[in-house]
Structure formats: structure tokens, C-alpha cells
Design a protein with these regions (language model features):
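N-terminal helical cap/lid subdomain that shapes the substrate entry/recognition surface
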Residues: 2-108
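Structured helix-beta-strand junction loops
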Residues: 52, 120-121
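Glycine-centered short loops/turns at secondary-structure junctions
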Residues: 121-122, 199
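Asp-based, Mg2+/Mn2+-dependent phosphohydrolase catalytic module
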Residues: 1-7, 20, 112, 116, ...
């Protein structure tokens, strides 16, 4: 019998195919706003956007920039990189893209099967750094909201993964303990290292095939169905 009673799960790119939904939404918005006036291709836009976006999310996670600054800078940057100074256009891209993403019914393969297996056996909670207005919508769109007792969102609480305080909040607010809980996520730095720092066991969903990890997680899987063999 498993020692765990509570399973905290990251949403984006762990259960929800955020990358796929984002690319589809970005392409629609790119075409709608005729960004081909400024970029050689959609791929050029994404190549400019992606690394800067990752940097900004790291800053946001450390509390160095606000949510509004994150959105303003990351959507302005690709335009500025090709010599276009137009914050209004960048803001429209942001609004259009973010409104489209949660309407995409995209789940990581094996998601529904995993949740069907876990639901009768454990208390399930989402623990996410994603924006509050998007996460609930994504879960309703994909039909997975009812599997979860609660959504614990850093955007609502004001503390981001990997900070220990967020994991402690998650435990305290759900009546869980570190010893009877486990965290599932695809981001080593935020999900896995953060949980470990709070004394919580972890399942690293290594969907990207990362190697040379800073430390060995409690468990490591490359597909969601593998989690069934652990829990």
C-alpha cells in the first residue's frame, strides 16, 4: 500500500500540452495581426520569443518582475529585435494569444488514463505557476477539472515555485504533510527541486530527456503511464 495520500501535480506540459496549445495559438495570432510584415517567418518569431520568454519566467519565479512586466516585455521583445517599437501591437498579441491558449483541448498522452487511476486512490491537487485566469479554463476545456480537489496557483498566492513557502502553503492549506505527499512535474528546477527542498518526494516527468541532473529525484519517468507503476 502506498505511503502517499496526496498527489500534487503541475499542469502545463505535465498534464496539459501547453507547448502545443501555445504554438497553435501563437500561429493564429501571428497570422491575424499580419506579423509577416515584420518577420521572415513564424519560426523566426518563435526563435526570438522563446529564449527571452524562458529568461523572463525565471525572473518572475524569483519575484524580480511582475506578471504585467513579464507579459509586456516578452511580447515586445521579438518586435524590438526586428526594429519595431509598438507596445500597443505587442499588447494586442498578448491578449489574443492568451485568450486562445486555454480554448485548445490538448492533453499530454496518457493524462486521462493516469487521472482515472489516481482519482479513487489519492487526493489530487494542481500546483502551478500558471496564471489564474488561464489554468481553470484549460482544465474545463480538457475535462480534467473534476479530478482535482483544488488548484493551488502561485498567481493567486503571490509565491512561485520553487520557493519552499509555496510548497508549505500547499501542504498546510490541504491538510497534507510532506511525508504523505508527492509532487509530479516536468520542470526540474521548479517542481522537483522545490518539492525536495520542502521535504516532499518527487516524480520527475522527464519528457524532454534531460540528463546530468543536479540530484536524483525520488522517481523519474518518461511517460505519464509510468506513474501508474509507482503509485
Amino acid at each position: 500500500m502506498s505511503k502517499y495520500k496526496n498527489v500534487f501535480i503541475d499542469l502545463d506540459d505535465t498534464l496539459y500540452d501547453f507547448k502545443g496549445a501555445s504554438m497553435e495559438s501563437f500561429k493564429e495570432t501571428y497570422d491575424l495581426l499580419e506579423y509577416n510584415r515584420y518577420f521572415n517567418s513564424f519560426e523566426q518569431y518563435i526563435e526570438l520569443y522563446t529564449p527571452r520568454n524562458l529568461q523572463l519566467w525565471e525572473q518572475y519565479g524569483r519575484g524580480e518582475i511582475t506578471k504585467s512586466e513579464l507579459n509586456r516585455i516578452r511580447y515586445s521583445y521579438p518586435l524590438e529585435a526586428v526594429g519595431v517599437q509598438d507596445e500597443q501591437l505587442a499588447a494586442r498579441f498578448c491578449k489574443e494569444a492568451l485568450s486562445r491558449i486555454p480554448t485548445k483541448n490538448k492533453l499530454i498522452p496518457g493524462c486521462k488514463e493516469l487521472l482515472e487511476y489516481l482519482y479513487p486512490k489519492y487526493n489530487l491537487y494542481i500546483l502551478s505557476n500558471g496564471f489564474q485566469e488561464l489554468q481553470e479554463h484549460k482544465m474545463q476545456t480538457t475535462g480534467i477539472r473534476d479530478y482535482f480537489k483544488a488548484l493551488i496557483l502561485s498567481d493567486h498566492i503571490g509565491i512561485n515555485k520553487p520557493r519552499r513557502e509555496l510548497f508549505e502553503y500547499a501542504l498546510n492549506s490541504t491538510g497534507s504533510t510532506a511525508s504523505n505527499s508527492i509532487m509530479v512535474g516536468d520542470m526540474f528546477e521548479t517542481d522537483i527541486a522545490g518539492a525536495a527542498n520542502a521535504g516532499i518526494d518527487q516524480i520527475f516527468f522527464n519528457i524532454k530527456g534531460s540528463e546530468n541532473l543536479p540530484f536524483a529525484p525520488t522517481y523519474r519517468v518518461t511517460s505519464l503511464k509510468d506513474i501508474i507503476g509507482i503509485l
